[in-house]
A protein has these predicted regions:
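Short, well-formed alpha-helical segments that are part of the catalytic scaffolds
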Residues: 13-26
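Acidic donor-binding loop at a coil-to-helix junction in glycosyltransferase catalytic cores
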Residues: 185-192
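Conserved donor NDP-sugar-binding/catalytic core segment of glycosyltransferases
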Residues: 105-136
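Acidic donor-binding segment of Leloir-type glycosyltransferases
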Residues: 25-68
Length: 338
């Protein structure tokens, strides 16, 4: 047993979910915590004989487990909550239509070192045959090639992003889950892991960590039939990729300060450090006069809201609350932006 939290967000897939949980129980290395977010019918599964027995096995295996009735707002919100609820630094994100090979977690851990932000293996649909050379998990190939996880993996590969299921380090997820997406959460895993990569963490694919994707036409995100949600998420995805290109490649950052006067003065303390890291610093300020002598570009909060899909995720007080922050706000600003 390892200090790992397995997280599953589910919606109306209780049969599939039982397969996932049974395959977690039968891992050669077992996580010591399992959290399931139920966004569906929210049944009392203790009344189901299959589930009643699964719960007994979880008890026998000493796996600390809980089922949390979600807000029915989609898996991204549930995954974001898991960052606050999970008791462990390592979190195993698993989809509710997965079937895990018995040694999947053991082999993920084998390659998980201090530089690793997230690590995944093959995510295979039954009776599919993608060729490795035709696949890619590079951001620039996302519209041209199948995902690299859909084909055989025979050695460690360093990639830009992961999808579906992966093991990750909680401290590498300082920005949280992309809760600016719709309930569908289209591109969630890509945005989540690619930002880790941009922050300097290794994102890896490794061999012998197979997960079968028992893709289901109903339940889960396929409960949402609103095509506009997918279009909106795709637009936000492309907007974030362009923002990150500016921030990480051209060293140009936009920071919204939608808070009080004192918070602006606190933020002012880190401007010299920001200028060391970035060539161009733009601040969306409620009190722009605080920065009149700092030689930074200033824009309005309204402009920042139009530019940043993740505007609300960057609120310093929301971030401190999520991260149970106990230090000074200046240190919070440093942690978030430096």
């Amino acid at each position: 047993m390892k200090d790992i939290t397995a997280i599953i967000s589910t919606k109306d897939r209780y049969t599939n979910l039982a397969l996932v949980v049974s395959s977690i129980i039968n891992q050669t290395v077992i996580p010591n915590e399992l959290i399931i977010f139920d966004d569906g019918e929210q049944k009392d599964l203790r009344q189901d004989p299959v589930w009643d027995n699964l719960f007994k096995v979880l008890y026998e295996k000493n796996i600390d487990f809980k089922i949390i009735f979600g807000e029915k707002k989609g898996q991204v919100l549930n995954h974001d909550k898991s960052l606050q609820i999970a008791k462990n630094e390592l979190i195993w994100r698993i989809d509710d239509d997965n079937l895990l090979l018995h040694n999947t977690l053991e082999n993920l851990l084998k390659y998980f070192d201090d530089k690793t932000g997230a690590i995944g293996g093959e995510i295979r649909l039954p009776i599919t045959n993608f060729k490795p050379e035709e696949c890619s998990s590079k951001i620039e190939d996302i519209y041209q090639k199948p995902n690299r996880q859909w084909a055989k993996i025979e050695h460690i590969e360093y990639v830009d992003h992961l999808h579906n299921s992966f093991l990750f380090r909680k401290s590498a997820a300082k920005w949280g889950a992309p809760t600016y997406l719709s309930s569908v959460g289209h591109r969630e895993e890509t945005l989540f892991t690619y930002q880790m990569k941009l922050d300097g963490w290794d994102i890896k694919l490794v061999p012998n960590a197979l997960i079968w994707h028992l893709k289901n036409a109903t339940g889960g995100i396929r409960s949402y039939n609103n095509e506009e949600m997918y279009k909106e998420d795709e637009w936000k995805f492309n907007r974030m990729i362009n923002i990150w290109k500016l921030q990480y490649e051209q060293k140009s950052v936009l920071i919204p300060l939608d808070n009080g006067l004192g918070d602006h003065w606190a933020f002012k303390n880190i401007i010299p450090l920001l200028k060391e890291k970035y060539k161009f610093v733009t601040i969306a300020a409620c009190f722009p006069e605080v920065f009149k002598d700092d030689n930074v570009e200033l824009i309005s909060i309204a402009e920042a809201k139009d530019i940043l899909p993740n505007f609300n995720n960057l609120n310093i007080y929301a971030w401190m609350e999520k991260n149970n922050w106990k230090q000074h706000i200046i240190e919070a600003y440093k942690t978030l932006w430096l």
